[in-house]
């Protein structure tokens, strides 16, 4: 909020901006954004899908705060779990090689109607499919699941998924 250079007190600016966050992004604004992204991309783009985490170890008043594997502290031999949220992101590279998001969702297994991380990933895949038609989906380890292969085959999409070594 310092970057806005407004004469108002910081707390008032935060309150004003927070009120609008509750409403979310309107469907027309989201659609206009995605149509602009489509203009910036190639005819058959590469869509990268990946999960991340947002860790809130000291949080206790956050809605639906779950337990996530902390990617910053975990190693291949040791997993560290903390309070936080999962983040699923899908992005493309524009014709000028800039990454641009086409899907972003913060989610938690503690949400009321939460089904699974795969459900969120399928939403990202469907978003890319509906926006571009034909694309190549690229995903890292963790997505090497028959459900992913079947979903992408069902939609007639090309894909590259790095497999786990085990």
Map each language-model feature to its residues.
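Conserved, well-structured functional cores that handle cations and Mg-NTP chemistry
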Residues: 1-166
